[in-house]
Amino acid sequence: MSIKYSNKINKIRTFALSLVFIGLFIAYLGVFFRENIIIMTTFMMVGFLAVIASTVVYFWIGMLSTKTIQIICPSCDKPTKMLGRVDACMHCNQPLTLDRDLEGKEFDEKYNKKSYKS
């Protein structure tokens, strides 16, 4: 049984996309409280704030994505972006590292923490 690795940028984009749908769902719940304007407005505003939060997250990951290192994945030969010391390919989820000390070691995201000493 192998562990499924995922690219950090894709994880953050998935979180932002889920915020959009959660926000729309929360705002839609407000429709069921049309008789009570306060509750309806509260649901609509919370849903709207979730959609705005997703916009902020998308903007942040877009800015972060422009600063990442682009490499060619050795498995699928497609360009991918790397955040941190270890990451996974965006296309084939192959574990990747640019740190020579980590080559050949088992993939672990703890290598990206500043408190980790190799």
Curated annotation (Swiss-Prot):
Superkingdom in the source lineage: Bacteria
DNA repair is among the record's keywords: no
Membrane-topology annotation of the record: Multi-pass membrane protein
Compartment(s) of residence: Cell membrane
Name by which UniProt lists this protein: UPF0295 protein BC_0520
Alphabetical UniProt keywords: Cell membrane, Membrane, Transmembrane, Transmembrane helix
NCBIfam families, alphabetized: PRK02935.1
GO cellular component, one term: plasma membrane
Protein's organism: Bacillus cereus (strain ATCC 14579 / DSM 31 / CCUG 7414 / JCM 2152 / NBRC 15305 / NCIMB 9373 / NCTC 2599 / NRRL B-3711)
